[in-house]
From Swiss-Prot:
Function field: One of the primary rRNA binding proteins, it binds specifically to the 5'-end of 16S ribosomal RNA.
GO biological process: translation
Protein family per UniProt: Belongs to the universal ribosomal protein uS17 family.
Entry-linked PROSITE patterns: RIBOSOMAL_S17
Species of provenance: Ligilactobacillus salivarius (strain UCC118)
Keywords: Ribonucleoprotein, Ribosomal protein, RNA-binding, rRNA-binding
InterPro entries, A to Z: NA-bd_OB-fold, Ribosomal_uS17, Ribosomal_uS17_bact/chlr, Ribosomal_uS17_CS
Highest rank taxon of the organism: Bacteria
A Pfam family annotated for this UniProt entry: Ribosomal_S17
Subunit structure: Part of the 30S ribosomal subunit.
A molecular function (GO) term: rRNA binding
GO cellular component annotations of the record: cytosolic small ribosomal subunit
Protein name according to UniProt: Small ribosomal subunit protein uS17
Length: 88
């Protein structure tokens, strides 16, 4: 079972919302090469992730892992908090 678990997608991103109970919104930024011009183009995608203990806050860098559907929009769960946000 651990081999199949390692095949799940793992993304690293930044928490942009933690207003829902046990749910965070994570924006994952990545790059693609433009087909014609070859320039790297940055694009981002938002994912909702399950945060069981409400430990992630806005601005944190987190890792999320693909899991079974937990709700209509949640398909990921919080794996770990890589870096806490600096609160000024």
């Amino acid at each position: 079972m651990s081999e199949s678990r390692n095949q799940r997608k793992v993304y690293q991103g930044r928490v942009v919302s933690d207003k829902m109970d046990k749910t965070i919104t994570v924006v994952v930024e990545t790059y693609k090469n433009h087909k014609v011009y070859g320039k790297r183009v940055k694009y981002s995608k938002k994912f909702k992730a399950h945060d069981e203990n409400n430990e992630a806050k806005v601005g944190d860098i987190v890792k999320i892992m693909e899991t079974r559907p937990l709700s209509a929009t949640k398909r990921f769960r919080l794996l770990e908090i890589v870096e806490k946000a600096v609160i000024l």
